[in-house]
């Protein structure tokens, strides 16, 4: 079995994102049979190359002294890229502030209180042209793909592109957009789903053959996933399995949520194992509450399966706004840690280290 650990492509990524070619590019169309898809810049073009984390935050209205104090407490933020991480995240927070979704806080105050929200780093975990696969470490709060447009004929008989998506803030881009920018010569097919709120391993195929081989493994439940989660409370057991059936929550007006439905739901199974019990260190409403870091292994692959099975166990995920009462944590603490693909000729294991945020969010003693 080959183990493929995360390797950073940070230098090449920054060189590309800060190039004049990248900043002048507004969209990219494929010369393929399907309609061209819209493509949006991932970096914030308003941020000058080389801008520090401090100066970027100040430019978004953060108090300079408060920024310095935050950086003393969270020195890792100094390493975040201003153009591709901090500025897009701040634009996103300003978007939420404009919609009244940050309560009494401003975007700058929210970022300074829980600066982990500013992290948005992509990494290429594995690239194998001969097999036709690319594995990526996706940031949290980034959707998997961008809704594609279509071609229509205008009054002059010309084929013109109609888009289904308009970016809502500077840097409002998907994992697909990043893949298209980083690997512009490939067509990317996602081999599985990963929730927008979840970070971690995403496997893509660049050929139909590769996509078919991966789909077969997922269909036959031979592909194995491992997730890392931080949940509310201290489970009594160190290990347990949940078999609750899952189905659509027809009472949800937005049609987003699923629910436990033992009568009409689909069979679902997830195993859980406690890694560490401790206390939440996030500034805010959850500071000091009991939380647990744990590994989760879904046997089946239902939508929101891990999230629902943890809620069903009495331990919803920290930051899961759909299945917990937590509207204060800056992210949902669920990360796709590992993916094992047992192909006919060899078994490949794609893995990433646990995110730093998963270490910082929990302490052995109450803060």
Named regions from a protein language model:
Residues 85-103:
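Long, compositionally biased
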Residues 1-21:
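N-terminal chloroplast transit peptides
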Residues 172-175, 179, 208, 286-343:
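Pseudouridine synthase
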Residues 16, 27-46, 55, 69, ...:
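RNA pseudouridine synthases
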Residues 50-51, 56-66, 70-76, 82-83, ...:
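Non-catalytic tandem-repeat scaffold regions and their flanking low-complexity/translocation tails
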Residues 77-80, 100, 117-118:
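Short loop/beta submotifs within extracellular cysteine-rich repeat domains
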Residues 62, 98-102, 185, 223, ...:
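Helix N-cap/coil-helix junction residues
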């Amino acid at each position: 079995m080959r183990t493929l650990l995360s390797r950073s492509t940070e230098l090449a990524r920054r060189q590309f994102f800060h190039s004049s070619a990248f900043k002048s590019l507004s969209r990219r169309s494929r010369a393929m049979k399907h309609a061209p898809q819209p493509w949006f810049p991932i970096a914030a073009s308003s941020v000058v190359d080389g801008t520090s984390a401090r100066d970027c935050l100040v430019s978004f209205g953060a108090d300079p002294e408060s920024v310095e104090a935050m950086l003393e407490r969270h020195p890792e933020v100094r390493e975040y890229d201003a153009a591709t991480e901090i500025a897009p995240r701040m634009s996103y927070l300003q978007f939420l502030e404009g919609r009244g979704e940050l309560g009494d806080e401003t975007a700058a105050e929210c970022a300074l209180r829980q600066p982990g929200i500013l992290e948005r780093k992509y990494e290429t975990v594995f690239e194998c042209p001969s097999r036709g696969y690319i594995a990526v470490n996706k940031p949290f709060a980034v959707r998997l793909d961008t809704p594609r447009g279509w071609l229509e004929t205008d009054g002059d008989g010309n084929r013109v592109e109609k888009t289904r998506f308009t970016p809502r803030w500077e840097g409002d881009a998907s994992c697909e957009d990043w893949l298209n920018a980083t690997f512009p010569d490939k067509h990317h097919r996602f081999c599985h789903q990963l929730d927008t709120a979840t970070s971690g391993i995403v496997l893509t195929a660049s050929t139909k053959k590769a996509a078919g081989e991966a789909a077969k493994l997922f269909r036959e439940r031979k592909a194995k996933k491992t997730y890392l989660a931080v949940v509310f409370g201290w489970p009594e057991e160190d290990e347990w399995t949940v078999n609750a059936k899952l189905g659509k929550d027809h009472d949800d007006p937005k049609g987003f949520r699923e629910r436990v439905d033992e009568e009409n739901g689909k069979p679902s199974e997830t195993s859980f194992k406690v890694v560490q019990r401790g206390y939440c260190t996030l500034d805010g409403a959850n500071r000091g509450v009991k939380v647990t870091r744990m590994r989760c292994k879904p046997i089946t692959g239902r939508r929101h399966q891990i999230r629902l099975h943890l809620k069903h166990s009495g331990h919803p995920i920290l930051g899961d706004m759909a299945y917990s009462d937590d509207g204060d944590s800056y992210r949902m603490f669920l990360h796709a840690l590992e993916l094992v693909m047992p192909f006919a000729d060899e078994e490949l294991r794609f893995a990433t280290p646990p995110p730093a945020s998963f270490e910082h969010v929990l302490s052995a003693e109450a803060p």
